[in-house]
Amino acid sequence: DQGYENGYTDRILDTLKEKNVKTVFFVTGPYLEKNDRLIRRFVDEGHYVGNHTVRHKSMPLLSRAEAEKELLELEKAFEEKYNAQMLFFRPPMGEYNEETLKIAKELRYTTMFWSFAYDDWLKDKVRGPEYVVNLVSQNAHNGMIILFHAVSPDNAKALGSVIDTLRGMGYEFGDPIELYKP
């Protein structure tokens, strides 16, 4: 998730490129406005850019019109600037209801949740890359979708080892779109 930039995204992108792994970067409106160079790297290096809404508000608390505006405003700004589509939506904070899912589907989004996450958005809570590698590997499972926030120094340092460890356990990293094919 890319709510704001903390200086680790280039390292994350370098690791993903080195390990030949594609991912989805979920961005908000402020991130889109302030991080053109990084978003260009996302697109140019073959990653997906997902819709995390303009203002990162709890979707169930919004009216239908407000929820649609949150998605469509960001989508329009992204598509106009980068000539690419947003295919995935992740509800801010994971908060959603049936109406949220219905709106996203009507706007032709695939809603992507996660099957593993931890409190890595707390950027001052540093536990070291070994902690991340151990936590991910202990929770590894088929079809795993890992939610990492790019603001974490631990994630940036651990990513290469996480990929290597999971591959060593027999897991493969696929194109995110493949997870949603019928």
Residue ranges and their predicted role:
Residues 48-55, 94, 148-151:
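Histidine-centered catalytic micro-motifs
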Residues 6-11, 57-85, 95-142, 155-161:
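Alpha-helical scaffold elements lining the catalytic groove of polysaccharide deacetylases
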Residues 1-62, 66-86, 172, 178-181:
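Active-site beta->alpha N-cap acidic-glycine motif
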